[in-house]
Amino acid sequence: MNPQELKSILSSGLLSFPVTDFNAQGDFHRAGYIKRLEWLAPYGASALFAAGGTGEFFSLAASEYSEIIKTAVDTCATSVPILAGVGGATRQAIEYAQEAERLGAKGLLLLPHYLTEASQDGVAAHVEAVCKSVKIGVVVYNRNVCRLTPTLLEQLAERCPNLIGYKDGLGDIELMVSIRRRLGDRFSYLGGLPTAEVYAAAYKALGVPVYSSAVFNFVPKLAMDFYHAIARDDHQAVGKYIDDFFLPYLEIRNRKAGYAVSIVKAGAKIAGYDAGPVRAPLTDLTSDECDMLAALMDKQGKQ
């Protein structure tokens, strides 16, 4: 799949990122991950991101990363394209990128580098180096320490033909409008704020109709139904989903930092697809919080 074909795929439909399965000892659980992918793939996501932020990329060893990407690519070979999360320091990100390409990933989601303060010129140089290390398509994720401007993105687009996507995790509407207007159809644009459904209607109005769904991991039917309501501009249905599910969900998610990942793993366990615990420094939901989530999920009906 060439970068432009990937761009076309990412320009419509719902995207998601499977959680990564760990056993009770916290090690990668391949059989559970395969079962998860086989369950989720038929629901109709346009693409899946393996070892992304919700997949706890930041906590994976290099050897685990290779096994996770290979498992995802092999399991979904005939059903849905797999993009691999990559990140960290530049040379580390390049190693991950080249390994994901070797293993058959159709594209990359370039996560922000970790911790080190840097100018956005430096961040742009980091993005360019990763893009030029591979031939497959790359989506850059503006979030946290990565705050690329329209001018820098335009320069990167000229230098890196395989940079085909922009994912927004900042929620800076002025910046998003500026990027969308400046870059036009050069990129596919993805909404990437935590629990992106809450912002989906607003982002669609900005020209960003595609987003990645975390709740697809445990209420996939609801996630797809909500996406279709967004796509057909059914504001009444969208409002009902937000009132009945997403706002109560946020009340649980917002209780602790890091729960944007932890609550997804809790939901997967309640749905019968236990992915094991999150790894430190994240913490799992308490039993009371899991009960609250289970009651909320039960109200949504069979998935």
From Swiss-Prot:
Keyword vocabulary terms for this entry: Lyase
Pathway in which this enzyme or protein is active: Carbohydrate acid metabolism; D-glucarate degradation; 2,5-dioxopentanoate from D-glucarate: step 2/2
Domain of life: Bacteria
Alphabetical list of InterPro entries matching this protein: Aldolase_TIM (IPR013785), DapA-like (IPR002220), Dehydro-deoxyglucarate_dehyd (IPR017655)
Catalyzed reactions: 5-dehydro-4-deoxy-D-glucarate + H(+) = 2,5-dioxopentanoate + CO2 + H2O
Top EC group: lyase
GO MF annotation list: 4-hydroxy-tetrahydrodipicolinate synthase activity; 5-dehydro-4-deoxyglucarate dehydratase activity
Pfam families for the chain: DHDPS (PF00701)
BP terms from Gene Ontology: D-glucarate catabolic process
EC number: 4.2.1.41
Gene3D superfamilies in the record: Aldolase class I
Keyword hit for Signal: no
Similarity comment text for this entry: Belongs to the DapA family.
PANTHER family attached to this UniProt entry: 5-DEHYDRO-4-DEOXYGLUCARATE DEHYDRATASE 2-RELATED, DIHYDRODIPICOLINATE SYNTHASE
Matches recorded under HAMAP family: KDGDH
Protein name in the entry: Probable 5-dehydro-4-deoxyglucarate dehydratase
Organism name: Pseudomonas syringae pv. syringae (strain B728a)
